Amino acid sequence: MYKTMIQRIQSIYLFVVTILSVTICFYPYASLGDRELTYSSSPIYYGLSTIIPVVTFAAIFFFRKRILQMRLCSFSIILMLFQAIYMIASFFIASEGCKEGLCHLYLPVVVPFINMILTYLAVRGIAKDEAMVRAADRLR
């Protein structure tokens, strides 16, 4: 049962998204001179960084319910978009009093965009599976 789940490329995409979402929690996403914006610096960022890996990891196990899996992935993409917007907006708001050259964005800011692309690829793979199952049902 689980062997067929792991062989699906969209399951691998979703697993990579889960891993990336968890790893960005351990690194600061911006430097503001003497302080850094991190995972625990805001309850909104904390909440999004907790919900996204849980939703994407849960979506892996709904491989038999492809429509629900696509909905979970779409919901996850929306959350990732909010996370990326929040990270960038909080940096620009917090960096207003920062001196030139002392404020920097780090690599974790790019991760939500990578996650969105991988999740979109997973949705496409799930849709292909659903189309293949429906075509097989028509032949029966």
PLM regions: where:
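Cytosolic juxtamembrane helix and N-cap/initiation of the first transmembrane helix
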Residues: 1-23
